[in-house]
Amino acid sequence: MALLVRAALLGAALGPACAAVHFREEFTDGVNWQRRWLNSQYKPDLGKFKLTAGKFYGDPVKDKGLQTCENSKFYAISSRFKPFNNKGKTLVIQYTVKHEQKIDCGGGYIKLFSSNLDQKNMSSDSPYYIMFGPDICGSETKKVHVILNYKNKLYPIKKQIRCKVDGFTHLYTLILRSDQTYKVKIDNEMIESGNLEDDWDFLPPRKINDPTVKKPQDWDDIAQINDPNDVKPEDWDEPEHIPDTSAARSKDWNNATDGEWRHPMIKNPLYRVRAGTIFDNFLITDDEEYAEDFGYETWGETKDPEKVMNIKQTEEEKKRERAEEEKHFRERLNEKVEKKKESGKNKLRRNTVQKEEL
């Protein structure tokens, strides 16, 4: 899944030498967001978005954003803004993303396109200038993408930048400066920086392989081999089927006649694309300080209350689960008591019959 944000990086030069805000979106005006954002119609089965603050939040209005709401779907939505030219200026791209579903596999990244993008037919094949944001899939992929278009060719950053993998809202910021330096920030804290020429393969390498050198005959190309002494841990758990925790016991289920109820088994989805990601607080500007302040005014003010609400909900859920377990325990205990009583009555009847026969 990828949220594709429509951007225009070509056009008229900027005017005043002050902070320029090219795009800002907080989704605080209710349904009016639908006038500014357009779902791609490239495929009929693309997933849809809804406006919500999610299951837990710091503020019911400020934390509203676009949420993916269909599992195992691809998503594409875009918003248009006035073209601009960032030549000689800093470019700051910033937004918040929350994987409240504790995602197994899916992207939370955005893309910036040219002004000639066909929004209705936008797809993964649509050319773009910049791709930025987190991408998660299983235990192997938990990284922040920074892909830049240079001379119509896409170049990913060579460094590995780890993204946040919890279920809370996080602020992602990309800063590209005119002096060829960059910064990547998460939650307004710098996690990576450097020089564009060093960390992307835009230019030919300064050194190349010597074509006259030949590989020795006894050269071993295998960098790693399987450890023959390694064995799978005894507690390794990767069953083919797992309980369906979303299933509920029917009201007419009777443990005495139907047996103890258990969750039905389903195939184990090791890495499945789950919906629930929320995108919010988009900002494109040329001012680093403005972006940092905007981040604190939005994400910064609601991040702590969001965690408090989540903790409260978790505690309440645990109480409900304990109450349900106690209820089932009492039901099973009562059933056993009733069975013993019935068994005692049957034994008494047999003894009475035997005495009468004597």
Across the structure, where does each feature detected by a protein language model lie?
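Extracellular carbohydrate-recognition regions
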Residues: G11-K43, Y296
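Extracellular glycan-recognition surfaces and repeat-rich motifs
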Residues: V31-G65, S126-F132
